[in-house]
């Protein structure tokens, strides 16, 4: 009699490649062989990459969702775009979030009411609540990373207003000690809350603007820089060049990780909505960076201030941008949109539905879609297990 353990390894790998990310825990418990293959096979990553399928996680309607995006038909004359498969994660269905971040197979969820953080390992099905040293704020910036010993940490950047000058505070949460530590950092940069950063190889990167003091008043210089936070040293590295210059104009910028190997940056000046520019790194580490052009398009849609997360397909030469539709004062609702832009002014859009109005008469009134990972790789990092619906102290 043939059992599940008798199936050929290549057949098991094919089966595992078709299993949703959030169901792998149940599959692993079927037999020892399947458990071992699921760890080494990494969710059929090779197969999905060959088929132009992007697997990951995102935030939609204040909920954590798994995402599968198939770009196989893009740029083909007879090809049709398969709409993204977005499914709410049932394990976290009691949790409303305002931001999501990803690093090393872990997902960091910022709770919507700003009362706590939740770290989730989708592969192991484990969660860990993290409690604040003091109150979280709506404009806090976060990053997830790890040091040279693979010890995971969280960076929090928050605003202090002791005077009319804008001042930032910095603190780091250490998973191994279950504690926060305030950093002695004298900020020389302004990291806007709507500037979306990204984690790469354990370090966190942020777009920023250098500060200068004129007549005792701090103002924003016109120099745009990329900052790297080194989780081993728990310090920022030197300011690195970005592949654009805003000339002190208002602009939007967002970072994305490319296959855990490169960074991509999306840039748009608010006075020139018809143009979007995307560049990717040729080389990057905490002290150096070089860039190359990936895409410049004039398809003409303004990226929403608090949205604009994206990923790129290097083979198809397209970018997939998650956004809100353009605001119109006469409309009573807005829609969550996926824009697909490419060379030669290629443009498609997918309507993902009405964006919930979560804060009437607020500058963040509508719930934006945010993608935090498009090339998810499972992690064996152990978290203390606690139920998402109950906030217990972590040991």
From Swiss-Prot:
Extent of the Kelch repeats: 154-202, 210-256, 265-314, 337-383
Recorded superkingdom: Eukaryota
PROSITE patterns named in the record: FBOX (PS50181)
Every F-box domain range: 1-47
Keyword Zinc: no
Keywords: Kelch repeat, Repeat
Pfam assignment, any one: F-box
Keyword Repeat among record annotations: yes
Name of the molecule in the record: F-box/kelch-repeat protein At3g13680
């Amino acid at each position: 009699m043939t059992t599940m353990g008798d199936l050929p390894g290549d057949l098991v790998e094919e089966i595992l490649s078709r299993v949703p990310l959030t169901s792998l825990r149940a599959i692993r418990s079927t037999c020892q062989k399947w458990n071992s293959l699921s760890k080494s096979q990494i969710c059929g990553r090779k197969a999905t990459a060959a088929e132009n399928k992007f697997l990951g996680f995102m935030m939609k309607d204040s909920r954590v969702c798994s995402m599968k995006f198939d770009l196989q038909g893009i740029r083909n004359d007879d090809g049709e775009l398969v709409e993204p498969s977005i499914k709410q994660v049932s394990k976290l269905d009691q949790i409303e979030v305002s931001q999501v971040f990803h690093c090393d197979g872990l997902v960091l969820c910022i709770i919507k009411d700003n009362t706590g953080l939740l770290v989730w390992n989708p592969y192991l099905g484990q969660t860990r609540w993290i409690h604040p040293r003091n109150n979280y704020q709506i404009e806090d910036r976060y990053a997830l990373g790890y040091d040279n010993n693979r010890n995971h940490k969280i960076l929090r950047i928050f605003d202090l207003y002791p005077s009319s000058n804008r001042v930032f505070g910095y603190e780091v949460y250490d998973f191994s000690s279950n504690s926060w530590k305030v950093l002695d950092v004298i900020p020389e940069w302004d990291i806007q809350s709507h500037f979306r950063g990204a984690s790469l190889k354990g370090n966190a990167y942020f777009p920023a603007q250098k500060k200068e003091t004129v007549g005792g008043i701090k103002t924003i210089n016109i120099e745009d820089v990329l900052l790297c936070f080194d989780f081993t040293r728990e310090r920022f590295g030197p300011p690195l060049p970005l592949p654009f210059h805003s000339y002190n104009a208002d602009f939007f910028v967002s970072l994305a990780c490319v296959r855990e190997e490169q960074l991509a940056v999306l840039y748009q000046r608010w006075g020139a909505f018809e143009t979007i520019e995307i560049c990717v790194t040729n080389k990057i580490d905490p002290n150096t960076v070089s860039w190359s052009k990936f895409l410049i398009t004039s398809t003409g849609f303004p990226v929403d201030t608090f949205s604009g997360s994206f990923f790129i397909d290097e083979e198809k030469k397209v970018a997939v941008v998650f956004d809100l539709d353009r605001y119109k004062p006469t409309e009573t609702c807005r829609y969550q949109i996926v824009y697909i832009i490419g060379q030669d002014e290629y443009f498609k859009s997918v309507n993902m539905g009405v964006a919930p109005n979560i804060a009437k008469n607020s500058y963040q009134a509508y719930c934006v879609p945010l993608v935090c990972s498009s090339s998810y790789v499972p992690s064996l990092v152990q978290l203390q297990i606690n139920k998402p619906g109950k906030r217990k102290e972590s040991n």
